[in-house]
Amino acid sequence: MAAAPSATAPKHNYTLGTNASQLELYKYLKTVPPIPELRQAVTIKKYEEASVDDTLYPLIDEHQIIMVVGAFFGDEGKGKTVDAVARHPACTCVARVNSGENAGHTVFDDIGRKYVFNLAPSSLLTPNTRNYVSSECVMDPISFMEREIGQFIKSNMPYKDKLFVGNVFVVTPYHKLLDLLGSAPNSSTLKGMSPIHASKVTKRGIRLDHIFNDEGVLRARLAKDMDTYYGLLKVKGLTDKDVVRRCEEENADGVERVPGYVVDFARAENKIDYLVKLYTERVKNNKDFPRRCDVTHELRAALARGEKLLLEGPQSYWLSNAREKFWESTTSADTTAGGLLASAQFNFQRYKVLVINVHKAPGSSRVGIGANPSSFVPQDYYSAQDIKTLEALPKGGCVDFDKIQNFFYTKAFNTESKTFNGIYEPLEYEDATGKYNIGVAMSIASARHHGECGAVTKKPRVCGFFDCVLHFEVNAVQGPYLSISAVDRGDDYDRIGITIAYVYYDVGNKMVDANGRVYKNGDIIKAGDPVPCEMALYHCYPIVKVINGWKGAPIAASKRRPNEPLPKGVCEFIANVEFFTGAKVISIGNGPRGSDIIYLKQ
């Protein structure tokens, strides 16, 4: 059990072992009365496997616009569902319509070659699709060419007739430096998202078309927008040499978080000349740059012809800047289903829209900073200790995942007790490297065992329980259809936990006023109750329902026969998620390949 960070001063002396503050916290939390839902009987349906033709395709047939969106904090494994939808015969167009390269997904072609996409739609390798990056997206065209298009050039994979780019907002090197210099350590992807969206809403900066037109206008707009960059340097008392040094420090561990051309910009004496030359040579006069078009017009025309359109959602519902609850720690675009539809600029009265939410469990995760009530450790546990990659985790510590998860679910959760209230005891797990708070051990072991690190940042993700409190709202806004990825991870668990409620507790007995409701110690927030703002969520702890696992009856595609009955534990997990959230689970992931999906008979 980890003490919550303060919303105003989230600096802590975190420890590996259980400390006095955690023991003091548990001293109170163990007195919280059990809520009836912990013992409430949930009807366990017999979920049966069906084909994609009998489950997903009929849904697609009934709609013109299909959206695949994240339902938690990103990194849910959306690419697999995107690929499945894109392979529908009538789905001809796939588009990214907002946000930028702060997303990340890995796909493999038919001969096993690996491609990593950040802004380009992940269906670029899917036959018979046209792929678009819409004008409401933000793009660093240099990074886009180097990291994404460069993969196609290197492998001689044609893309000119499959990928089209609209008049995007241009992320410049100074946007990325503003991100680096202005963000708290380990709190950002360093892709310049906040600064470019600030330029966007203040109508400064440049769009892609500016690079292809009058150079004088291009120079003037860049100069005006760079006032913010120079202003930050002045306020912080930084020189160009200081900025270069900061970039080198960020890249010192071998992970290039600040690209070379961004460092060169910081070194450049005449920065406007540097940018104009950079964009002229590597964008305007670059024969390899993708074809440009009015994406909105092309997509509307496709819909008018009766074609189906897939909108690929970046990030997720709770990382959307339009969501009040986590506003301080979100991305800078509206990445909800409604935000995607608005960015696409369609007449929503004319078309039927299908939304498929994607979540991940076990091992639901988040990167960055902010509140995360269902996590094993506070969300800033790694960032506060400057742990930037999985390799920086305690060497040799918490490597026995099987032993740790068993200890966690059978010892820390005393489910046999009549007074069990869904809150685990902060016991210590010990291995050859020392003693670990069980939440810390579970967090480290989960990150290692499941390879949970950011697709963009490489930072270890903070793992936790499937959060029914948060998903209830997602389902209310853009449900009911839900695909849960990585369920085959449950093959390695004796039991599975899901969060069905929170309890509010502040060690200083402080109350939080959120939307007129005052939250005080002992208040319970259940699935279906209003979700408070982050100021309150920092002091919320998960009430966990523990479900029997299915260890010994694996569902992983490499071990399971097709159409084999699903284990009782899997059915119990799905039934509880549906019961507490109102969602309708249409598929579960059971392996790393795109085809490793079990569709559920509807």
UniProtKB/Swiss-Prot annotation:
Question: Membrane: is it a keyword of this entry?
Answer: no
Q: What is its main location?
A: cytoplasm
The free-text cofactor remark is: Binds 1 Mg(2+) ion per subunit.
Fetch the Pfam families from UniProt: Adenylsucc_synt (PF00709)
Q: What class of enzyme is it?
A: ligase
Q: Name one GO cellular component term.
A: cytoplasm
InterPro entries, A to Z: Adenylosuccin_syn_GTP-bd, Adenylosuccinate_synth_dom1, Adenylosuccinate_synth_dom2, Adenylosuccinate_synth_dom3, Adenylosuccinate_synthetase, P-loop_NTPase
**Residues reported in the UniProt entry to bind substrate:** 455-461
Tell me the cofactors it needs: Mg(2+)
Q: Which residues bind Mg(2+)?
A: 75, 104
Which family, according to UniProt?
A: Belongs to the adenylosuccinate synthetase family.
Self-association and partners: Homodimer.
Record protein name field: Adenylosuccinate synthetase
Species annotation: Trypanosoma brucei gambiense (strain MHOM/CI/86/DAL972)
